[in-house]
């Protein structure tokens, strides 16, 4: 019988700790990442006709190279599409990661886990293992995050593999500055997890600022496309914290505004610059799969 399989996989916001999920780092000490699955999706569809011929198609709400984990979500969607119904989310995430590794991706595991699981998660990486703690702030605190953490697509594409290579090359030879930066990012992940669990806005802001300082220690070029504009807003006390999403060097930037009443003003300001605001909500479902007989 002909059938159609529809899959939806969310992308993510990496609040803090990204970079430390890469195996070369978490083989030495734990990686600590906090991320949020969001309602910017990769959708895949597979149609199997009566003669068992296949047709597979994909669409994405965000372009790849945006820093929102779209590539990881795409592979979670692919694995979910071709596997049988009822596949465990953790198994799906690991299969998607291993699939990317076969294609030469040397990044970490956070994107696949965020997309497969949904929600807000504190992920701890030790060697090849992943431990997940789901964080469930109150509805009020979630609304604060959704209303005060703004995302903007700069339309400057980054290639995360190129950005990662130089950092990890230096880390492997024991570069103290790189190690310091990565450890700062790890500490930011732990602080962010604490801030979300205790609903401390100041901890969330401090964690994002610590994460950005750690990324700047890895290389100031990673935040350079955003620095001039966002430094001005920080000095004006309109922005409390900001960071590049993903590896940086372009793509999407996230910023926490100091007051919700500044939201429209800041969106208008960046629209003039050519940046696009990305409205978002927390996705709690993770990857979903529906199958229909035709």
Spans of features found by a protein language model:
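Glycine-rich nucleotide-binding loop
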Residues: 248-250
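Short pre-catalytic strand/loop immediately N-terminal to key active-site residues, enriched for Gly-Thr
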Residues: 62-66, 240-242
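Conserved N-terminal helical subregion
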Residues: 31
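Glycine/charged-rich beta-loop-alpha catalytic/anionic-binding loops adjacent to active sites
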Residues: 52-64
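Stable alpha-helical structural segments in soluble proteins, enriched in small hydrophobic residues
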Residues: 73-85
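C-terminal nucleotide
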Residues: 1-16, 21-27, 35-53, 84-88, ...
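Short, conserved phosphate/pyrophosphate- and ester-handling motifs at nucleotide-, phospho-/glycolipid
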Residues: 71, 246
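Short, non-helical or kinked segments that cap or interrupt transmembrane helices
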Residues: 69-70, 109
């Amino acid at each position: 019988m002909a059938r159609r399989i529809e899959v939806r996989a969310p992308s993510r916001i990496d609040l803090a700790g990204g970079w430390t999920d890469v195996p070369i780092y978490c083989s030495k000490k734990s990686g600590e990442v906090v991320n949020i699955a969001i309602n910017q999706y990769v959708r895949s569809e597979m149609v199997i006709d009566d003669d068992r011929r296949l047709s597979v198609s994909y669409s994405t709400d965000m372009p790849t190279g945006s820093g929102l984990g779209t590539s990881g979500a795409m592979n979670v969607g692919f694995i979910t599409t071709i596997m049988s119904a009822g596949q465990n989310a953790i198994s799906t995430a690991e299969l998607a990661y291993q699939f990317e590794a076969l294609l030469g991706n040397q990044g970490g595991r956070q994107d696949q886990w965020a997309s497969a699981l949904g929600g807000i998660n504190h992920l701890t990486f030790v060697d090849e293992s992943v431990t997940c703690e789901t964080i469930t702030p109150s509805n009020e605190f979630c609304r604060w995050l959704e209303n005060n953490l703004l995302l903007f697509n700069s339309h400057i594409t980054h290639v995360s593999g190129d950005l990662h290579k130089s950092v990890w090359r230096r880390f492997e030879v024991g570069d103290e500055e790189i190690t310091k930066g990565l450890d700062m990012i790890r500490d930011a992940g732990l602080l962010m997890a604490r801030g979300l669990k205790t609903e401390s806005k100041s901890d969330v802001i401090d964690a994002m600022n610590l994460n950005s300082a750690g990324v700047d220690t890895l290389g100031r070029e990673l935040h350079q496309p955003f620095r001039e504009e966002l430094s001005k807003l920080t000095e004006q006390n309109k922005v409390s914290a900001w960071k590049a999403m993903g590896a940086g060097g372009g793509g999407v930037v996230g910023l926490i505004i100091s007051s919700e009443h500044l939201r429209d003003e800041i969106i208008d300001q960046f629209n003039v610059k050519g940046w696009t605001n990305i409205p978002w909500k927390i996705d709690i479902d993770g990857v979903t799969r529906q199958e229909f007989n035709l």
